[in-house]
């Protein structure tokens, strides 16, 4: 069983092909805050670590949404939405269980 936690974003995006990795039981898709450096950010890191401590032996994957996280919301938000939607589609296609 694979569960996804995501921000409510949905715009088409093609996910690049990467090396095959085992599917986690739970996949967190996290968009860092505006102005934060690339990655999950401090809140995303804390959330993922807290979740891992609560799910027993289930595996937790973490995906940092790739977007500018800038105050230019007209370009930043759509880019983040596209990347997050692409990751959701990628996980659904490659980790259907």
Language-model segments: residues:
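Sec-dependent N-terminal signal peptides
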Residues: 1-7
């Amino acid at each position: 069983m694979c569960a996804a936690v995501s921000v409510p974003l949905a715009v088409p995006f093609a996910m690049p092909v990467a090396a095959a990795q085992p599917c986690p039981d739970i996949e967190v898709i996290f968009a860092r805050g505006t102005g934060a450096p690339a990655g999950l950010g401090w809140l995303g890191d804390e959330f993922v670590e807290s979740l891992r401590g609560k799910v027993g032996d289930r595996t937790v994957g973490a995906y940092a949404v790739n977007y500018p996280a800038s105050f230019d919301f007209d370009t930043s938000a759509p880019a983040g939405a596209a990347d997050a939607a692409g990751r959701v589609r990628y996980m659904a296609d490659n980790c259907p269980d």
